[in-house]
Amino acid sequence: KTLFIKKLKKIKKKNVVLLGHMGSGKTLLAKKIARELKIEHYDSDQKIVELEKKSISEIFESRGEKYFRKIEEEVVLNLIQKKNIVVSLGGGSIINKNIRNMIKQSSFSIFLDVNLEKLESRLSKSKNRPLLKNTNILNKLKDLDTQRRKYYLDSDAKLQNTGSISKTYMNFIDILSKINVKNYKFKNKE
């Protein structure tokens, strides 16, 4: 834990933010990182659910995506101002320029990448993904990937999630060990 916190401080980053598509494993990995390093984890979607007292699907249905994105911005900007935490962001939050700018300033960001066909398989079982209702899941994922990938790839590091959270966590530790704290120019794009 101490090495982790020291490295974040030396590169002038307050926390770690996990980015990626819905179903990519951001929350599972963030929980593992938080547990192993004994730091707090926050999930932006869960915070929105707590704040609104409605599920994400219910918010989309009753208030629409525009309202959801407004609340998401407030929640995410508030979360990433905390220190020494891990945050798993909702898949679409990265399209917001204010969120992207705040992440760049304050956080070590990791894009958790997953093959779209694997994502389709994972998400086909889910009933609570409002953007996937009544649509061809793979086509929708391809559309979302086209809109978001350029922002995901602008993260500090990229991790491929092949399915094993333990292996993905070990890859995270490997990435962390490679950060050059004297001259922070780290980019790991696997």
PLM features: what roles do these ranges have?
Residues 21:
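P-loop (Walker A) phosphate-binding loop of NTP-binding proteins
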Residues 24:
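ATP-binding Walker
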Residues 18:
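Hydrophobic anchor at the beta1->P-loop junction of P-loop NTPases
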Residues 43-93, 97-104, 129-130:
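ATP-dependent small-molecule kinase phosphotransfer cores
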Residues 35-44:
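Post-Walker A helix-loop "phosphate-sensing" segment adjacent to the P-loop in P-loop NTPases
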Residues 106-150:
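A glycine- and Lys/Arg-enriched "phosphate-lid" helix/loop adjacent to the NTP-binding pocket
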Residues 27:
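Walker A/P-loop
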Residues 2-11, 32, 36, 146-190:
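NTP-dependent small-molecule kinase module
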